Amino acid sequence: MVNHGNMYGPSFTFLGIPQCDLDIPASFAGADVVIVGAPIDSGTSHRSGAKFGPQAIRGGDYLPHDGSRPHLALRTDGLKDLKVVDAGDLMMPGGDLVASLAVLREATEKISRSGAIPVILGGDHSIASADVAGIANHLGRGKVSMIHFDAHADTGEDQFGALVGHGTPMRRLIEDGYVRGDRFLQLGLRGYWPDHVTLAWMRDQGMRSYEMTEIHHRGLTAVLDESFATLTDGCDGVFLSVDIDVVDPGMAPGTGTPEPGGMTSRELLEAVRRICLELPVVGIDVVEVAPPFDSADITAILANRVVLEALSAIAKRRNGSTYSPTQNILDR
């Protein structure tokens, strides 16, 4: 029998961390973070392939999959300093998007109620309507604020006549009362959608959307400073949703709806680090990685690093130690 090992086996976990089974609560009892894959792209409007995203993200690394990743800047190990387990991919029937999202909603609620932070690997962005809802079912509707990185607002009233799709989840979350519109922030929007009617709806909900031109001229640091004050007002936790197409397609080509003029990979990683260091994050999803359109796995590697950045920063926040981005790393 051939032993492929943790890195190349037919079923491998995120960088070799322990497995768990959501049907066996004891297998993730006491976990700080549970990673779960949502391999579905039935909600896409253009290029499919995001259903292959979860495993691409899990394997997006050139180092041994040994369940350890010391962070050079933060001096923490997000996979060791936290108890992180991987539940594998959910069974999500591609022909029934509504049923698949119900499976995800139940799974994220179960993880949240266990006391762990769900980290969901997508999959297309339709999954946000389910994973955020699952956490809100536990913590309370309107008690979870949201920070959403994306080239697109995803606030469509419908998607080619369908209420569920990767262009509508943020509208569904607000209309269904899971997230308050005035505690919903978006960063990285650009391009040629949505239309003025949808923008008016977003304004009426109290949403705050930072288009890339504003971010460029004001600076990402100033935008994040302004965002953080809003996110923690009247809410018990923050959900971080990262659509990889927020990054310029020159740095993240492997996605379904690429839009030029986006963030750099460094900007995204620094933003994720700050969010997870400074805010009470209760859930994360990383979506729209479409390996068939990737080049040399650079999009999958970036998505992998988004997850690692978040876990490392959460570990740093929990251990209470200080961090200065301008300090010499040898003196930390």
Please tell me what each predicted stretch does.
Residues 2-332:
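Conserved alpha-helical scaffold segments that buttress catalytic/binding sites
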